[in-house]
Amino acid sequence: VKGGAGPRRHELQGGSVEAQPLPSKRRRQVAVIGSGRIELDSELGRLAEEVGRRLAEGGVTVVCGGLGGVMEAVARGAADAGGEVIGIVSGDSAEEANPFCTHVVATGIGHARNLAVVSSGDAVIAVGGEWGTLSEIGFARALGRPVVALRSWTLKGEGPMESAPGIVPAASAEDAVAAALEAIG
């Protein structure tokens, strides 16, 4: 919905999200969040890497927390596909970022950087995750950002198998990226 007149609602499997218009010269950005404690060669690591690759192939800039685990895996996938990765790190040195980040923002604000990560994305994809990921999902929804959950927190909607409004579950990296891109138009 580049240069559109306003937000558009998209109905997706498992929920709906609202697409926001983007300024015409800005690349789309998707924040990818998840645990910093996973191994890169684990199943979640491989999923995150595929998410990064697919986003980069779609011309999307990846935003992440810039450290290890899911953040490093998604950055590696995007960088290997020639994409750009913005790592927003919690410390005050760009040197702490993983080697796949093409741009680093050193915040020096600890976990508060979680808000900066999700507010920098037009949509958010959560891959696995722990308590920090849950906080990022909460921030994203409070900001009105669509969230796609890939083996992550979906929270409870009204029915026993429903996710909370604005959180769309995805079964694969391909589905997660497709849902995020559909949400941002």
Model-derived segments and spans:
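Generic N-terminal amphipathic, Lys/Arg-enriched alpha-helix
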Residues: 26-41, 58
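General beta-strand structural signal in soluble alpha/beta enzymes
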Residues: 63-65, 87-88, 169
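Short acidic-hydrophobic, aromatic-tinged amphipathic segments that line or gate anion-handling sites
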Residues: 104-108, 166-176
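N-terminal amphipathic/basic-hydrophobic helices that include classical n-h-c signal peptides
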Residues: 1-16
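Short active-site oxyanion
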Residues: 59-62, 124, 165-166
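A charged, well-structured terminal subsegment
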Residues: 123-124, 170-185
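Acidic/glycine-enriched connector segments
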Residues: 46-56, 68-143, 151-162
